[in-house]
């Protein structure tokens, strides 16, 4: 999601909160989903080591596709990389590859450039939980939301890329320049994993269940395209996306040309899926299923690393973290700092939760607002977006969910548990290899004052988070809207 759209989404949420449209937490039984089971598979897993390679792998897979490409994403940008990948998908469809894209509708308006592609006989695009408002911008969208919040609050947050049912990419990335290090303004530090093996069949079934459900509709039912103008809007957008971007396109092709064979690790992989019943009862199917499976695989962990862009507990209860601490586990949290967060709402609530976590002796690493990644094409500011949990440096969760109420109760998510010490060590290295350059270590000094330390730098005030933020943070807290975050 681009920064401009994130800001606009915040405006929409603000309007909804101001009008009093905040849902309450559902009643959840203590043993909810405790009996849910998933099948463990042997698979080959490859942690894609850089952001540019994550995009290059997708292009390479599309060019090699022979039969089918299935995808699910929360957002797909109309920018250089977003349009480049769509064009590659169109070329695959020209070779008789069946292309299916399920896309959340929150950020799709009257985007004829996208609906254009659905005219191709081998391309189908469906929108999840679509809005009625398409042409009135965010004001119309916000009004639509405020009058039908119970339905429209649920969003599709999965990120899924499957080629020929043989190769699959999962992780936290949506599709756009800023997810792969190619934005000139700001980028996300994120993660993707490439899979091969029998586990993909389970994701095939999950994809088909959503594709066939009442919750998705063909894009051209909502965005009308004239047959005589076939591909005109897409071609125009593609030309605009390429304009003055020759160096970026050349660099992407160079990345593809120099791709090595993936260094796969053999591992036991267990898929975790959400339930579409969540759209009716808002219960935390995915969160509970994931935690139950973790307990089965690691009953008494001694160490846990939790990586999430947003750390907002459900109903102010850190149930998962408290359970770890009760078992004497050392808990490390890696998340955004107040200044590095791409959400205008999260810092307002995270401020108090930081203190609670420090009270629990959680080790906290906060991402710097001016963090620069050496593998990004443009060395600009970045936002932390990695979503993973690692138990005992052995069992690793990789998926689409954040550590917040929205992922628990409102969004549809997916993920996997990977049982492999070698893979877990790779993930920890991936997250922390630039530790001093990218993170503040947050703790309390002897007097009890909160401090942020990085190398020889010591801060006693929230780094790069000015007093100008205090008023909006106060207003956001008064709205009591954590359930929506």
Features from the language model and the residues they span:
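Charged, low-complexity intrinsically disordered terminal segments
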Residues: 21-126, 130-156, 163-485
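Bacterial N-terminal signal peptides that target proteins for export
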Residues: 2-10
């Amino acid at each position: 999601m681009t920064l401009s759209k994130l800001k606009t989404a915040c405006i929409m949420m603000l309007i909804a909160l101001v009008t009093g449209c905040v849902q309450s937490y559902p009643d959840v039984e203590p043993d909810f989903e405790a009996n849910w089971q998933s099948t463990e598979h042997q698979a080959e897993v490859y942690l894609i080591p850089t952001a540019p390679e994550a995009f290059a792998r997708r292009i390479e897979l599309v060019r090699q596709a022979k039969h089918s490409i299935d995808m699910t994403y929360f957002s797909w940008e109309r920018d250089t990389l977003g349009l480049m990948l769509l064009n590659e998908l169109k070329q695959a469809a020209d070779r008789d590859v069946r292309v299916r894209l399920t896309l959340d509708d929150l950020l799709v308006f009257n985007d004829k450039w996208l609906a254009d592609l659905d005219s191709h006989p081998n391309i189908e695009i469906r929108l999840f939980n679509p809005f009625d408002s398409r042409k009135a911008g965010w004001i119309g969208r916000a009004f639509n939301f405020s009058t039908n919040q119970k339905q429209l609050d649920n969003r599709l947050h999965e990120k899924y890329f499957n080629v020929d049912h043989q190769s699959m990419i999962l992780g936290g990335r949506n599709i756009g320049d800023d997810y792969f290090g190619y934005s000139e303004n700001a980028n996300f530090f994120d993660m993707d994993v490439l899979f091969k093996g029998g586990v993909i069949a389970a994701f095939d079934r999950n994809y088909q269940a959503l594709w066939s459900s009442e919750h998705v509709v063909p894009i051209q039912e909502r965005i009308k395209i004239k047959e005589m103008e076939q591909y005109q809007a897409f071609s125009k957008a593609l030309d605009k996306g390429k304009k003055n971007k020759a160096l970026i396109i050349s660099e992407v092709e160079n990345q593809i040309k120099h791709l090595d064979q993936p260094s796969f690790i053999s591992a036991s992989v267990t898929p975790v899926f959400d339930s579409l019943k969540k759209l009716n009862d808002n219960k935390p199917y995915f969160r509970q299923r994931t935690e139950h499976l973790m307990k089965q695989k690691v009953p008494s962990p001694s160490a846990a690393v939790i990586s999430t862009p947003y750390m907002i507990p459900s109903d102010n209860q850190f149930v998962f973290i408290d359970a770890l601490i009760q078992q004497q586990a050392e808990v490390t949290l890696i998340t955004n700092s107040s200044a590095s967060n791409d959400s205008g709402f999260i810092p307002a609530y995270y401020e108090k939760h930081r203190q609670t976590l420090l009270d629990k002796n959680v080790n906290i690493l906060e991402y710097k607002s001016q963090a620069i990644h050496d593998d990004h094409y443009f060395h600009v500011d970045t936002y932390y977006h990695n979503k993973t949990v690692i138990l005992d440096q052995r069992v690793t969760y990789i998926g689409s969910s954040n550590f917040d109420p929205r992922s628990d109760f409102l969004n549809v998510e997916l993920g996997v548990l990977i049982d492999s010490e070698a893979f877990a060590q790779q993930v920890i290295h991936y997250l922390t290899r630039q530790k001093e350059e990218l993170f503040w270590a947050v703790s309390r000094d002897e007097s009890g004052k909160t401090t942020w330390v990085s190398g020889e730098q010591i801060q006693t005030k929230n780094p790069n988070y000015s007093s100008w933020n205090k008023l909006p943070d106060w207003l956001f807290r008064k709205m009591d809207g954590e359930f929506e975050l």
